[in-house]
Structures are given as structure tokens and as C-alpha cells.
Amino acid sequence: MKSIAVTGYKNFELGIFKKDADEAVYIKETIKRHLLPLVEDGLEWVIISGQLGIELWAGDVVAELKEEYPIKLAILEPFEKQSANWNEANQLWANEVLEKADYHAFITKRPYESPAQFAARDGFIIDNTDGALLVYDLEKEGSPKFFYDRALQAKEQANYYLECIDFYALQEVVDDMNQTF
């Protein structure tokens, strides 16, 4: 596998409102633990669309991994000015991750017009990656459901790699990191 999309819940869907909240440490560690074996097996690109939450945390993780591994980060935003209505802290976070990217493009080269641009994003990313890693629990629907449904279809039709990190997997990392010996 040469390329993987990483997506999942937006931070506010998880009740997290700061990029560096305590919970983010566990989320980033979980993403890292799932990406690292893929990177060691030859993964070359991680693709995100620059959404708040899981995607930007994944971008931070890839930036850390780039210090030791030949991994690259691509940000394929669904439309221009995606972060225009975000608060200043979130715009800053998005720009910090964008500066670490090896590639950046807009899937539709115009500002937001309709939800169809999100569907276009999902289709383009799935069609141009070998798999997807989602922080998504099937028991708690949210915005990742649309990407998940489309990726599941690709898995069934074209042997697309699909891995979901659910809340149990996140809790295992929390427990592991908090163990005292």
C-alpha cells in the first residue's frame, strides 16, 4: 500500500474544542500506532482533506513521523477557503498543518457551494488512495459516516483497505499510556 486517507470525527463531535486538549494526546498516539506499521511496510503518502479534528491531528502525526521515515503528507481540500469561517485558533491550526504538507490542492477550485463538494472530495480521495484509516465508531454516527459508507463500498468492490479505530481502541491506548508500574 502506497497511499492511505485518514479521516474521522471533527473535534467538536468528540466534545474537544482545543487542538492541544488532553484527549488529543491519546488520539494522536492511537493514529500513530495504526500508521506506523503501514509506514514501516512502505506507505508513502497520507492524505487528509484538512478538516478539523482527526484529520489535522493526523497531519500533526505525519509531521512527527517525517522526522524518521520517508512519509509524505497531502492535503486535498474539498473547496477553496475551507477554513474561512473557522475561529482564529482553528485557522492557525489548519495553517500550521498546511505548512507541513508535501502537497496541497483543492478538489473543486472554487469556494463552498453545496454538500456535493464533500461527496466529490470523498470520491476523489477514495479513488486515488489504496485505503483509509478512520477514527470512527459504528455505534456513534457522525460526519465520517458518509466517507465510511463510500469506502466500505470500495472495499467490497475493489479490495480497498479499510480500518476503523473505534472508541474501544482509543480507550486501550488511554489505558496503556496511563499504566503505572
Curated annotation (Swiss-Prot):
Pfam family, one: YpsA
Disulfide bond sites: none
Domain of life: Bacteria
InterPro entries per record: YspA (IPR010697)
Family under the similarity heading: Belongs to the UPF0398 family.
Protein name, per record: UPF0398 protein LMHCC_0668
Species name: Listeria monocytogenes serotype 4a (strain HCC23)
Organism taxonomic ancestry: Bacteria, Bacillati, Bacillota, Bacilli, Bacillales
